[in-house]
Amino acid sequence: MINGDINEFIEKLWSGEELIYVYNGKKYFSQGYIKEDKVYVFELQMWEPDVKTLWQISGKDNQESYEIFLEQPLFDGKTFWEIEKDTEWVDD
């Protein structure tokens, strides 16, 4: 993880905090939240070069959502763990 500690990033990811990170020239945003009907939602959006929701899961708890997210090939066909060393954690 560039510009950050991977353990801190993963802790924030697990807790659903809003995170912004860049991989391969693309800016990503992820967050988890509880809707009014008490359903937990975790989502991944791309902010640059295009704005779109890439992936979303709902109805699972944060732990299960987090584990499923980490297994998905969402980043140019790679999982988060495959891109982690080349990913920059940004705050903007």
Where are the predicted features?
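Short, isolated positions in well-ordered beta-strands
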Residues: Y28-F29
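Short, surface-exposed, low-complexity cationic segments
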Residues: Y33-Q56
